[in-house]
């Protein structure tokens, strides 16, 4: 779904020689020399929560937790954020607002969610039309209005539909594009 790529590109943007970026992951998906990376190892009881606890001893500025799956990990992420660390992580939710619901369902008190959460980014990867065979077509006002509801947006002058060719193995699609929902908090 691209979560790791988004997390890593964000961390790479934030990482400088003066900033100590630490990660706890399961598994480490990309080795990055500018990060201090640690892998979850359940066989020695090193889970996400224990990893965050260990990382806090390394004086990190930024901590990336591969995934918040339970209250113990959420609590450690909250504690790290409360002590001045920027914490980035992933949660399995369908959209940005549901991330708050998910944290509350895990058992994080609402006042701690309010005190520590600075923003949520939800993302989806969608297929892109094959540039070799996509076909121009007339936009359908009814379909467009249903797609952009509840907003009113002008009908585009040109839209495309999939066709299929050798380049895309007759699917009409080639590649993926991220669609992001950003929900900042103040």
Positions of the model-derived regions?
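Short, flexible helix-loop junctions that flank or precede catalytic/ligand sites
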Residues: 1-186
């Amino acid at each position: 779904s691209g979560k790791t790529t988004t997390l890593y590109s964000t961390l790479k943007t934030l990482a400088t020689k003066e900033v100590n970026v630490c990660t706890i992951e399961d598994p480490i998906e990309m080795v990055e020399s500018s990060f201090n990376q640690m892998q979850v190892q359940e066989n020695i009881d090193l889970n996400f929560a224990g990893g965050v606890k260990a990382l806090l001893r390394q004086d990190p500025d930024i901590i990336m937790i591969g995934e918040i799956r339970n209250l113990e990990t959420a609590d450690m992420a909250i504690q790290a954020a409360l002590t001045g660390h920027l914490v980035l992580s992933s949660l399995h939710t369908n959209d940005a607002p549901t991330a708050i619901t998910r944290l509350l369902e895990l058992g994080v008190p609402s006042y701690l969610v309010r005190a520590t959460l600075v923003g949520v980014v939800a993302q989806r990867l969608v297929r892109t039309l094959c540039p070799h065979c996509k076909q121009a077509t007339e936009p359908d006002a009814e379909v467009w209005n249903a797609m952009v509801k509840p907003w009113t947006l002008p009908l585009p002058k040109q839209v495309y539909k999939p066709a299929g060719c050798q380049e895309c193995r007759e699917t009409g699609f080639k590649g993926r594009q991220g669609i992001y929902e950003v929900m900042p908090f103040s």
